[in-house]
Each structure stands twice: as C-alpha cells, then as structure tokens.
Amino acid sequence: MLYFKCAQPVPGKGEAWTLYECGDDQTVLRTLTHIPVTGEVTRVPDPIVKKLYRPEMLQPAEAEEFTALWGEG
C-alpha cells in the first residue's frame, strides 16, 4: 500500500488534510479528510475518483497515520 497526503486551508477551521490509501499502482482505495483544529474526520471508503490527480503535489504519508485516523470516530 502507498499513502499520500495534502493540505489546504478551510476558512474558520484551519488546515484540512486529505489522506489517500492507494494500491501499488496508485489506484485510490480509500480517502479521508482530517481537520486537526476541530477534530473532524470524514471517511470515504469507496471514493468516486480512483486515480490520483497530480500525485507530484502530494506528500508521502505513513500507514499508521491513515489507519489511526480511519479508526477514530
């Protein structure tokens, strides 16, 4: 599995981090969005978009980070 993340600002809430869980071929399997300031986590177990868009803009992420956030709730 491969894991990636990216951040973008959300007005009034701070940074929103989107994390991607991908197969070895970079097919997106699951995604989640986490806003650390508010503690919000939105999980998408079967995302509509299955291909990473502009993967060169993403940062590597750790499996532990993704699974810890996925298990919250």
Model-derived features: positions:
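Negatively charged, low-complexity tracts enriched in Asp/Glu with abundant Ser/Thr
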Residues: 1-13
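Intrinsically disordered, low-complexity segments enriched in small/polar residues
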Residues: 1-2, 18, 51, 64
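Small/flexible residues
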Residues: 4-7, 32, 45
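Assembly/interface hotspot detector across virion components, adhesins/toxins, and nucleic-acid enzymes
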Residues: 5-7, 20-22, 58
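Short linear sequence motifs
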Residues: 10-13, 46, 59, 63
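Short, flexible N-terminal segments of the mature chain
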Residues: 11-38
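Short interaction-prone segments
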Residues: 34-57
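Short, compact, well-ordered microdomains
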Residues: 51-73
